[in-house]
Amino acid sequence: MYHSIQDIIDICNEENMEFWEVVQRADMDERAAPSAESWTNMANIYQAMKDADKSYNARLRSASGLAGGDGEKLGFTDEQMIHAMYVSAGVGAVIAENASIAGASGGCQAEIGSASAMAAAGLVSLQGGTVENIAHGAALALKNMLGLACDPVCGLVEVPCVKRNVAGAVNAVTASQIAMAGIVSAIPVDEVIDTMRRIGNAMPESLKETAGGGLATTPTAALIAQRFQKCE
């Protein structure tokens, strides 16, 4: 079992295991499940993601027709994707244990920031990175999201949440590429995670999903709220 990213790295080095294998083994131990059951469970989650993607138009392209459909060209196998999902899950589990993954607890840094770190770690795995690369990718992604407030307009998870998700996704790709280029995080990932916890604790409640501050209290947000009230 592990309680930090460094724990995972140490296990990988001591037992000659891959990052994803350590996470899968922990899942098996926690749920008293055999390897096949753990794998099937993760495969089902991946399938659910692919099924959700089917609602989008696969032929959709940019106005010029030069952009779109590039994800399909990467050609990763289901096995590679599931390995990456285990990696992402491992990072997420550590963040959840040592900090938070809820905006109501730690601000949006705990939601989109955590998701971005998880995605960056998974992307590094897909690119064949080492366990150390994975750790740096997660650290670099999360550092860029520290201090992000959770200030949804009208308390709805729409504005500015949807746009911030895009920023988190791009941040994850960038962080993974930086890590794969050999750039390291000056602050270890576990310390970055703890920093997120401390920042979240220092945040006022108005910036923790209460719609009591930030963008949720702008004049335009007030007008949007009035419009909703008229519809009730």
What are these regions (language model features)?
Residues 1-66, 182, 189-232:
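Generic N-terminal targeting/processing segments that precede catalytic cores or assembly contacts
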Residues 34-44, 73-76, 80, 160-164, ...:
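Catalytic cores of large soluble enzymes that bind and process phosphate-bearing ligands
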Residues 54, 58-63, 102-110, 156-163:
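A short glycine/serine-rich beta->alpha loop
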Residues 64-147:
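Phosphate/pyrophosphate-binding betaalpha-module
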Residues 116-232:
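Functionally critical mobile loop/hinge segments
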